[in-house]
A protein has these predicted regions:
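Generic C-terminal helix-cap and adjacent flexible tail
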Residues: 1-3, 131-134
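Active-site-adjacent beta-strand/loop module that shapes the phosphate/pyrophosphate-binding cleft
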Residues: 6, 15, 73-98, 107
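A short coil-to-beta-strand element that immediately follows conserved catalytic motifs
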Residues: 63-73
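Conserved Nudix-box catalytic region and its N-terminal flanking loop in Nudix hydrolases
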Residues: 19-59
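Conserved N-terminal beta-strand and adjoining loop/helix that marks the start
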Residues: 1-20, 41
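NUDIX/MutT-family hydrolases
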Residues: 88-90, 98-130
Length: 134
């Protein structure tokens, strides 16, 4: 029998200067200290878009409308205890100023500098796609 599939939605928030928001996983969490695209698990009955709208509010205190979420690509990666399926969306419009609500560090990063930020194995393949599209 294979690994359980965990569906996580992630968002590349892109500001007016073309920088992407990365969040550093806080101490005590799985993959602590690594940088990632904000997002979270898709709960039962949610679409990935619904999950992102909820997670962006909970984690960053911002409001996103579903039409502002553009699907970019996805990651499919096996960890030792589960298989991660992660659609990545881009968003250039939101309301509010992103603020770390869950103890995470935030950084606005130019796409050509994202490789300097250590990321989970599932996120790393997404960087080339982002550099090409942004």
């Amino acid at each position: 029998m294979g690994l359980d599939i965990v569906l996580v939605a992630a968002c590349a928030l892109v500001d007016v200067d073309g920088r992407v928001l990365l969040a550093r996983r806080p101490a005590g969490r799985h993959l602590a200290g690594l940088w990632e695209f904000p997002g979270g698990k898709v709960e039962k009955g949610e679409t990935p878009e619904d999950a992102l709208i909820r997670e962006m509010s909970e984690e960053l205190g911002i409001t996103i409308a579903e039409p502002c979420l553009a699907p970019l690509t996805f990651a499919s990666h096996s960890y030792p205890t589960f298989h991660l399926l992660m659609p990545l969306y881009a968003c250039r419009r939101w309301q509010g100023v992103p603020d770390a609500k869950e103890g995470q560090e935030l950084a606005w990063v130019r796409p050509n500098r994202m490789a300097e930020y250590p990321m989970p194995p599932a996120d790393e393949p997404l960087l080339a796609m982002l550099r090409d599209l942004l």
